[in-house]
Amino acid sequence: MSDISLSQLLEAGVHFGHKAYRWNPKMFPYIYSEVNNIHILDLVQSATLLKEANLYLESAARENKTFLFVGTKRQASTLIAQEAKRCDSYYVNHRWLGGMLTNWSTLKERIAHLKDLEQQEANNTFDLLTKKEGALRRKELKKLRRHLDGIKDMKNLPDIAIVIDQKRETTAIRECRKLGIPVVSILDTNCDPDLVDIPIPGNDDAVRSIKLILKSLTDSILIGKS
């Protein structure tokens, strides 16, 4: 299991929440104090729940479970793709398309179309088309890659979802809940802990905070797989 110390959490700014007026009262148990109208999260609880999440993911990886990383905000997008690839998992790091999980059969058709276009590109088929048609297909390929590249090799629904920014990814979380897919999520002070299975109280806006927690979760998956 990947262990993170309190000093590491503190240094990464994991404890900084949102302005007090933006809080969700359900996050009260995880809040340590309020300083200059900013809520400060209890890092002891953050460390404890991160450890719990790490143990859960390590155990799941040992059982060959599959993982879907979700984070479409600017601060998380690159990290989501990077960490998902590092542990050979799937990811959505741009816009979540409604029905990505709940309408999986239709989405698989879009993925098949993406792979067909990629094959056409590899075979230089685009160059044989009219300039306009070739440009249209390249544009479509670029758009499909942006949205589906991280899940194009996903054969079935994932076993577990790892989410950054619960408030932003409400559609993804709603689909996971509907399908019974457990959700591990970083929860800032404006989030609702009732909507996830394993909450990790933490700053979901700062890159250093997201990076530290995501890396720890990914390390645990890799330990389980090994």
Swiss-Prot record:
Cysteine pairings via disulfide bonds: none
Protein localization: Plastid, Chloroplast
A GO CC annotation given for this chain: mitochondrial small ribosomal subunit
Signal peptide: none
Organism superkingdom: Eukaryota
Keywords: Chloroplast, Plastid, Ribonucleoprotein, Ribosomal protein
Keyword Endoplasmic reticulum: no
Main location: plastid
GO molecular function: structural constituent of ribosome
GO biological process: translation
One Pfam family cited in the UniProt record for this chain: Ribosomal_S2
InterPro entries membership: Ribosomal_uS2, Ribosomal_uS2_bac/mit/plastid, Ribosomal_uS2_CS, Ribosomal_uS2_flav_dom_sf
Family under the similarity heading: Belongs to the universal ribosomal protein uS2 family.
Matching HAMAP family: Ribosomal_uS2_B
Protein name: Small ribosomal subunit protein uS2c
Gene name of this polypeptide: rps2
